[in-house]
Each structure stands twice: as C-alpha cells, then as structure tokens.
Amino acid sequence: MSEFAPICIYLVISLLVSLIPLGVPFPFSSNTSTYPEKLSAYECGFDPFGDARSRFDIRFYLVSILFIILDPEVTFFFPWAVPLNKIDPFGSWSMMAFLLILTIGFLYEWKRGASDRE
Amino acid sequence: MIIDTTTTKVQAINSFSRLEFLKEVYETIWMLFPILILVLGITIGVLVIVWLEREISASIQQRIGPEYAGPLGILQALADGTKLLFKENLLPSRGDTYLFSIGPSIAVISILLGYLIIPFGSRLVLADLSIGVFLWIAVSSIAPIGLLMSGYGSNNKYSFLGGLRAAAQSISYEIPLTLCVLSISLLSNSSSTVDIVEAQSKYGFWGWNLWRQPIGFIVFIISSLAECERLPFDLPEAEEELVAGYQTEYSGIKFGLFYVASYLNLLISSLFVTVLYLGGWNLSIPYIFISEFFEINKIDGVFGTTIGIFITLAKTFLFLFIPITTRWTLPRLRMDQLLNLGWKFLLPISLGNLLLTTSSQLFSL
C-alpha cells in the first residue's frame, strides 16, 4: 500500500500544477466585454455555418474498435511476460496459442479490409 | 532515497511521541519534498527542450534563433510562458465550456503521471513499482481523451477533425509501443524500470537492450514520435489542412498547456528510450577503468547520485536531437499512410519481434 502513496500525492500535485494555470487568467478574461465575432468559431474569416459536431468518417470508429480488441489482449501479456522463467512450458505455450488466435483474428480483419482507408 | 532519510527522522520523532498517525503525517509531508523537486526539474527540462528545439531549428534553417532574452536566449521560453499566462482567456460562444477548459489539463496530467516511475539514479525513483512501465502505458493512453474533449468542446470543424485524428493516431500507435515495452520486460523478467536498467548494467554499452532489441528500438522510436505528434506524424495539428487542429480555438495559457503537454511527452519518451534501451543511469563504458566506474554507480552518497542524474539526462538530451532534427528533414504523412504504417507495418513487425524475443527467452532457459 505504501508504494502507491507517492502516486496519490503526485496525482494531487499534478492536478494542482495543471489546474492553477487555468485559474490565473480569470481576472483578465473578459468574455462579456468582447464582440460576438471574436467568440465565434474560426473558419478562415467567414461566418461559421452549420454545427461542427456533424457526421464524421466511420473509419475513425473502426480504428477505435480495432484498438479495443487488440489493446486488452496485449495487456494480458504483461502478467505472463514478467515471470516467464518461473512458469512451466505449459504456461508459456498456452500463451503462444493465445498469440496465435490474436494473429489469426488480426489477419482476418486485415483481409476483410477493416484497416483499409480507401 | 526516500526511505533512508525517512526512517532515521521517523525514529527521532518516535522518541518524542509514540503516536502512530503522527508518523504517517510526517511521512506524507516528507514525500512532498521529492515530488516538488521532480516537478520543478520537469519544468526546467521542458524549458531546456523548448530552447534546444528553437536553437537547433534555427541552425538547420541558417537563422540565429532566440538571442535577446537572457544569455543565448535561454529565458525565451519563460518569457513566452509568462506572456501566455496574462493573455485573454477566450471561451467560444457555442462550445462546451467545461470540456473546453478541462481538455488541456487532462492531457498534461496524464503525461505528468508517467514521470513517477522514471529512475534518475540507482535509487532515485519516486515510486519503484513492480508494474512500472505498465503504469506509464496505462496512464499515457488517457491523453487522447483530453485531446478529443478539447476538439469536441471547441465546436469548430477544424478542432473536431483534429481531435479525432489525434485520438485515432494515439490509439493506433499505442499497440506497437506496448508490444515493444512487453519485449523489454520479457528480456528483463520484470516490469519495474529499476530492474530493467539493472539488467542492462553489465558489459558497459554492449549490455544495452538496443543491441538485443534493434527492431523493437526502431519501432519504439517511430511509435513514440507518433505518440508525441512530432513532425512526420503531426497530422492532428497539420497547419496546411486543419488550421491548428484541436488547438484552433485556444488562446492564452490553455494554448500554452497544449505545448507544455507536447514537450512533456517528448521529454518522457526520450527518458523512456534512455531507460528501456540505452542503459539508464549506468556509465556504459565497458573496458576503460572498469572497476572504478562500476564502483561509482554503487556509491550511495551525493556524488554517485549526481553522476547518475547527469548520465541519465545526458543520454536523454543527446537522444532528443533525433526527434528535433526529424522535424526539419521529413515530410508529413497522409492520414491513410499513417494508419497503414501503424496497423499494417509496425504492428506485425512488433508482434514478430515479440515472438522472436519469447522464443529466444524460452530456448535459453
């Protein structure tokens, strides 16, 4: 427990370090006294049209789905990698089977074109 | 470092009073001290990187660079930061105020947390966790959420696209990076950063993980460049396409916080290259004065600690020349090229590297 105490304290301090600068310019912020064009979205000098939160490319979504599949699987490798010299061959080879399944899934996704951007 | 001094002081206190909670309070307060020193050091490190980048950029482009603020323009970054602190704080009228304000802070916090586990000397680490590098990987993947929040909160088309691009790029390159770190912890049989450095301490620089993991080293550099959004991969803030990406609507210190976050990220990836691949605080000269130099690393006093910090920082800042010079030599990739490089080149290569490392570890048992 004590080895995680520095993390908590450091978390509080880094919160302070990044939140205090946000508070400093408040005396100088003058949202009320400026003209409305200054606060509108920047679109190269034209009046902004439409809403920015419209449709976006589905491929960004695909990338995040692929990430969600692959990242936890990679995360599972860490508890196996550290004591590799202490576990028996069964343990190491069962992780190889896991890696094989991961690779097959990745190849399938590749052949289906989920990571194509055209 | 913390433990030694604390135990003696705590014994002294216990002789005065036997209250247990007083001891805990004292330990907590004593723990603040190294943390504050670390934060101060990080800030100075960021200022030095900004200065280095401006000077190197200037000399690559045959300019002079900053020269008026302080000797050789060292104080230029400090002057810029102070100016940004007193700038007007604009909040876009149609945007989401909370997401807009919190976004840069989240990016900074998540990157700052990674510095916990960097060993600067043989016992000079804030938290020597057994899950060390894993903490960095877990915490550093919070940063794209901050960028996404700021892109969404600005309600600007450029910002929105920039935020999406930043998130997609960070998560694409997260996996090759993790696989490279995984290969390192396979080699060292530990995820603790201190153990990883000590596994490289034999045979001088021939013991570096760089020689045992050349593929992993290159993949790590490329992925960490992409994680830092440095120039071959700076698509989220591509000036010619999206005005400044997710930073378009920002002004004042929030804009500055994004820059602090990006330089902090650059510094921490360089520190991790030093720790994981370049032997950390070890002097790394194999043949000359071998016994004397190895004894230096074992000295516990101020001298050994200072030398450890100096060696770590020297390796880090020498390595930093690579990302700074790539900024002025390589052209920017297209978005589909970027994602293809991540998913179809780096990921299979790092998987193969992991397989190679595993089999070499298994057969050498």
UniProtKB/Swiss-Prot annotation, chain B:
Membrane-spanning intervals of the chain: 32-52, 98-118, 129-149, 257-279, 302-322, 338-358
Family the entry assigns: Belongs to the complex I subunit 1 family.
Record-listed E.C. numbers: 7.1.1.-
Membrane topology per record: Multi-pass membrane protein
Catalyses which reaction(s): a plastoquinone + NADH + (n+1) H(+)(in) = a plastoquinol + NAD(+) + n H(+)(out); a plastoquinone + NADPH + (n+1) H(+)(in) = a plastoquinol + NADP(+) + n H(+)(out)
Native source organism of the sequence: Spinacia oleracea
Stored NCBIfam families: PRK06076.1-2 (NF004741)
Source species, domain of life: Eukaryota
Places the protein is found: Plastid, Chloroplast thylakoid membrane
Principal cellular location given in the protein's record: plastid
Coiled-coil intervals: none
Keyword Transcription regulation on entry: no
GO molecular function: NADH dehydrogenase activity; oxidoreductase activity, acting on NAD(P)H, quinone or similar compound as acceptor; quinone binding
Name used for this protein in its record: NAD(P)H-quinone oxidoreductase subunit 1, chloroplastic
Gene that encodes it: ndhA
Highest classification ranks of the organism: Eukaryota, Viridiplantae, Streptophyta, Embryophyta, Tracheophyta
A Gene Ontology biological process term: photosynthesis, light reaction
